[in-house]
């Protein structure tokens, strides 16, 4: 399969640069994976599609203010995007500057927020391809430094500086475990009122953790998708989640994932468990799972997700789940109907196409 098979033309004005006034005020495109039929709805209509006994799985990762602005000892400006916190004083990060810092170089960060002379220093101790290992020379833990001086790491396509409102709106209301540098965006549509209505309806909920990395925005740089190497992200699927999934399946109910990160967490756990002859087992590890047309979904029956970038691994995942033709037809309709795209945009609710394995480009 060629990466260009997953291309579609997207007018710039359909990229959502700000969220809707209310979380659940987005539009919803319902796509029946088996029939390919779609329907224009509002996000609150999701309640019609999720039934008592169904299990809704969320990703409870919390976005860290991972973007820092600073300077090298020479005075040259740079930008740091923390990818992964290693311990209280070390992290792996992307660095943008005119010239990459050398090993043992000093970097001064946080002065734009904390004031001249009140920033903090980091040492570049090692480089691993595109990532730099930084050691922070401050008494406070790294998470505290980021809370004080970091900026919300809005995706590049939002194309504006972060604002105070993003501190709240670029987090899900149920976010709990610090570690992501991008939000699991399908969850941004859920407010407390909607979660309450789902509970009253008898819908079960469970939470996985996958710390979304900056690699989620990296373009696929190969021509054929089978050559693509996925970036690693850390995921946790607990015994409690496994028990709920097994109970849901035993009752003939559906497992519904909120977001592609929840899908990748659950399907990673299922893939690992298959080697032990199990349907699913607890999972605490990095995952590089890549789901594209021709790949199997062992657990997930339905999916809530946003509209993704052309030629991205995420539209490939949706194509694998809904069927390639169904997915691309629905996306074409979304463009023509002026749905809002990407992180702050509208959502889809998709039921699994049981014949998707035969629908590849």
Curated annotation (Swiss-Prot):
An annotated GO cellular component of this protein is: cytoplasm
Q: Identify the keywords attached in UniProt to this record, alphabetized.
A: Cytoplasm, Queuosine biosynthesis, S-adenosyl-L-methionine, Transferase
One biological-process term from Gene Ontology? queuosine biosynthetic process
Q: Which PANTHER family match?
A: S-ADENOSYLMETHIONINE:TRNA RIBOSYLTRANSFERASE-ISOMERASE (PTHR30307:SF0)
* Superkingdom per UniProt: Bacteria
Question: Gene encoding it?
Answer: queA
Protein name per the record: S-adenosylmethionine:tRNA ribosyltransferase-isomerase
Q: Its pathway? A: tRNA modification; tRNA-queuosine biosynthesis
MF annotations from Gene Ontology? S-adenosylmethionine:tRNA ribosyltransferase-isomerase activity
Record's keyword annotation contains Ribosomal protein: no
The Enzyme Commission number assigned here is 2.4.99.17
């Amino acid at each position: 399969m060629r990466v260009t098979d997953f291309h579609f033309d997207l007018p710039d004005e359909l990229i959502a640069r700000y969220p809707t006034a209310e979380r659940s005020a987005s539009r919803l495109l319902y796509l029946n994976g088996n029939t390919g039929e779609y329907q224009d709805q509002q996000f609150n209509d999701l309640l019609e599609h999720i039934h008592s006994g169904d299990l809704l799985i969320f990703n409870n990762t919390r976005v860290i203010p991972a973007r820092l602005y600073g300077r090298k000892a020479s005075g040259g400006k740079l930008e740091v995007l923390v990818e992964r916190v290693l311990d209280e004083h070390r992290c792996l990060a992307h660095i943008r500057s005119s010239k990459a810092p050398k090993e043992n170089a000093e970097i001064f960060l946080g002065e734009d927020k904390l004031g001249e002379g009140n920033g903090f220093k980091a040492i570049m101790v090692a480089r691993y391809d595109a990532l730099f290992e930084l050691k922070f020379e401050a008494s406070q833990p790294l998470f505290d430094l980021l809370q004080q001086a970091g900026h919300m790491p809005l995706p590049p396509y939002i194309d504006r500086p972060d604002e105070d409102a993003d501190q709240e709106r670029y987090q899900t209301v149920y976010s709990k475990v610090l570690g992501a540098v991008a939000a699991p965006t399908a969850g941004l549509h859920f407010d407390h009122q909607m979660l309450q209505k789902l509970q009253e309806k008898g819908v079960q909920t469970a939470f996985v953790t996958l710390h979304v990395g900056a690699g989620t925005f990296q373009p696929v740089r190969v021509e054929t998708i089978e050559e693509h190497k996925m970036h690693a992200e850390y995921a946790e699927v607990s015994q409690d989640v496994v028990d709920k999934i097994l109970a849901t399946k035993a009752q003939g109910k559906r497992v519904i994932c909120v977001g592609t990160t929840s899908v990748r967490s659950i399907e990673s756990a299922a893939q690992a468990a298959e080697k032990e002859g199990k349907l699913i087992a607890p999972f605490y590890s990095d995952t590089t799972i890549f789901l594209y047309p021709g790949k199997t979904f062992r657990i997930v029956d339905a999916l809530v997700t946003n509209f993704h970038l052309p030629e991205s691994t995420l539209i490939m995942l949706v194509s694998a789940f809904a069927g390639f033709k169904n997915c691309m037809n629905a996306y074409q309709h979304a463009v023509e109907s002026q749905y809002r795209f990407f992180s702050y945009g509208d959502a889809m609710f998709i039921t699994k196409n049981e014949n998707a394995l035969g629908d590849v480009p």
